[in-house]
Amino acid sequence: MLLTIDVGNTHTVLGLFDGEDIVEHWRISTDARRTADELAVLLQGLMGMHPLLGEELGDGIDGIAICSTVPSVLHELREVTRRYYGDVPAVLVEPGIKTGVPILMDNPKEVGADRIINAVAAVELYGGPAIVVDFGTATTFDAVSARGEYAGGVIAPGIEISVEALGVRGAQLRKIELARPRAVIGKNTVEAMQAGIVYGFAGQVDGVVTRMARELADDPDDVTVIATGGLAPMVLGEASVIDEHEPWLTLIGLRLVYERNISRT
């Protein structure tokens, strides 16, 4: 089986593939302070929950693919693969890795690995032109051209960042539960804040995607818009421009990149 690990700033998502199928997945908090040994213990606990894997770390795993937006965690995971997984082939997404997606940026090395991986999956699953909206710590909008190139994107504050900012900077406001409000017009402070977050972000998505699509394609209707990320369900159904929801887009992209590189490792 292939173990895929997507390390984000707030959460880390792990997926276990049997061929092209995700047979298990986990979401844990990202902690840049964890050592390789601590990560190995954590992985062993998670892997031990699956009936097709053995009790020893690495049993049943025949490949590993990792991308990370946190350099220190990537370093420790590299140590995990070296010390605990032995000869299991591992692909870590870094500059120079073969993705099959040309990056049309002033400095390609600046683009987050997860954003490129999302583009890889978008091209494979839907073709171009496409826009990937990833609802994570930041909300990112990534454009894929009709030729399958990474054409650039937009970075905006994420939903959780906005909620925290309201609670910290608003003298009479507080941190609230992320939930859908009963209506757009809130009848109390919590509902008003929830409405601002949910419908505000839905409006942001519609506005940004509409403008990007006009630049990306001669006919904006040709652009497929894919939503992913842990907080995507908060906005689905309210943002009118979203065509597809693929919660495992990054993990699928990691599988594809692994398959394109393993013969070279």
Curated annotation (Swiss-Prot):
Binding-site residues, substrate: G112, A113, D114, R115, T189
Positions with a binding annotation for ATP: D6, V7, G8, N9, T10, H11, T12, V13, T137
Gene Ontology MF terms in the entry: ATP binding; metal ion binding; pantothenate kinase activity
Keyword Oxidoreductase: no
SUPFAM superfamilies: Actin-like ATPase domain
Record keywords: ATP-binding, Coenzyme A biosynthesis, Cytoplasm, Kinase, Metal-binding, Nucleotide-binding, Potassium, Transferase
InterPro entries tied to this protein: ATPase_NBD (IPR043129), Type_III_PanK (IPR004619)
Cofactor: record remark: A monovalent cation. Ammonium or potassium.
Pfam families noted in UniProt: Pan_kinase
A GO cellular-component term linked to this record: cytoplasm
Keyword Metal-binding assigned: yes
Active site: D114 (proton acceptor)
Signal peptide boundaries: none
Superkingdom, taxonomy of origin: Bacteria
Principal cellular location given in the protein's record: cytoplasm
Residues that bind K(+): D134
Assembly and binders: Homodimer.
Function text: Catalyzes the phosphorylation of pantothenate (Pan), the first step in CoA biosynthesis.
Protein name, UniProt field: Type III pantothenate kinase
